[in-house]
Amino acid sequence: MGMWVGRGRWGRVWHDEPQHSLLMSVIVRPGMSVADQPKLSLATAVAVAEAVGLTTGLNVKLKWPNDVLVDGRKLAGILLESRVVAKPIVIVGIGVNLRQRTFPHALAATATSVDLEGGRAAGREELLEVVLDAFDRWRTRLENEGFAPLRARWLALADTIGRAVTVGEHAGVAVDLADDGALVLRQACGLQHVVAGEVIESRRG
C-alpha cells in the first residue's frame, strides 16, 4: 500500500513517502451500462469521504467530480480507468494522504494530509477496511437503486456547489449535479452542463 509515486488525473503523479499514504486499486466488473459507469467515480468519492470522516473525525468535502478536500485542500484523489478483457472492468485507484508533514513546493498550497489537519491518526489497514466497506455499499446502491441516493449524498458533501468556477472553456457558478453526473453551471446565458474537466475555483458565488 506504499509507493513513491502514483498516477493521478490528467497524467499527474501522486507523491508519497513510504508508509505515509493509503494507495490502493480496486478491480470492479460494473453491473451497470457503460453510459452510467462515470457515476462510479462519484460513488467512490462519497465512499472515501465518508470513510475518512468516520476514521479521522475530519470535516471532509467533495470537489467535482471526485477530489476529497479538507478546508479546501486535497486530502485524497481518485482515478478510474476502463479496461476490456474477457468482460469490461474498471480499475478504481484511490490515494489518501495520511502522515505527510510536507509536500513538494508545487503542491504545498493545495495538498494536505490527515496529520496536517489534526485528524485522528487512523492506520492504513483500518482506513482500507472502512473505505472498502463504504465503496461496496455505495456501488451496490448505485447499481440497485439508481443515481438519486448517490446524487443526494454527493450534494450534501459538495464543496463545489455555490462557488464561481471555471471548467475548461466554461465559467459560471456551480449550482447542481445533473442526473447524469454532470456539473451544472449557471451562466449569464442560462444553465450549462459540464461532463468533464478540472474545476478551478475563482470565488464564492
Enumerate the predicted regions with their spans:
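N-terminal lobe of the biotin/lipoate ligase/transferase fold
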Residues: 1-54, 204
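General beta-strand structural signal in soluble alpha/beta enzymes
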Residues: 60-64
